[in-house]
A protein has these predicted regions:
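A glycine-biased, small/acidic residue-tolerant capping/turn segment at secondary-structure junctions
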Residues: 112-115
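Hydrophobic single-pass membrane-targeting/anchoring helices
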Residues: 1-9
Length: 164
């Protein structure tokens, strides 16, 4: 099974920077799909919607997906052709997001088992998620600022921090 990143490997005549950027764009697209589901799950749990077990699964699956993305990012073809600081920002962002996703899954379980309270920010698992979530946002903003120039150079999609 090939990943989106490996699908861009070694096209003859394609500059390494373009190849790496295309592979990274594929990972960002994959991450964006997860991000939309996470946002919906967060809003559902905060509002005590029905289906909290499904929302918990979304958070757990997202944490797992972030680990997969991190592995693919580490194996990105021609990654040395991209700015190291940009890759470090994205790595840190996905690591922090993965931790936040795990904590949000625990928060959801707490809401299920203890009775859901709308916008319950006093839960220990919710509070544990805020620091890595804040760090992820900071790192995503730094990444997105650097990605914009790469995307522009190679005609690739732009990503705002809240789409990563």
């Amino acid at each position: 099974v090939s990943s989106p990143a490996s699908a861009a490997v070694s096209s003859p005549g394609v500059a390494p920077g373009r190849q790496a950027a295309q592979a990274l764009a594929a990972l960002l697209a994959q991450s964006g799909t997860d991000r939309a589901a996470i946002t919906q799950a967060f809003n559902a749990v905060a509002g005590c919607s029905t289906g909290l077990s499904q929302d918990q699964a979304i958070f757990s699956n997202a944490a797992s997906s972030r680990q997969t993305l991190l592995g693919e990012l580490a194996a990105l073809p021609d990654r040395s052709a991209l700015p190291a600081s940009m890759l470090q920002d994205l790595t840190a962002a996905w690591q922090a997001s993965g931790q936040a996703d795990q904590d949000f899954a625990k928060w959801t379980q707490d809401e299920i088992s203890q009775g859901c309270s709308t916008n319950d920010q006093s839960d220990a698992s919710y509070q544990a998620a805020t620091a890595p979530d804040d760090q992820a946002t900071k790192d995503k903003k730094a990444f997105a600022a650097l990605w914009a120039a790469i995307a522009d150079e190679y005609g690739l999609p732009l990503y705002q921090y809240n789409q990563i």
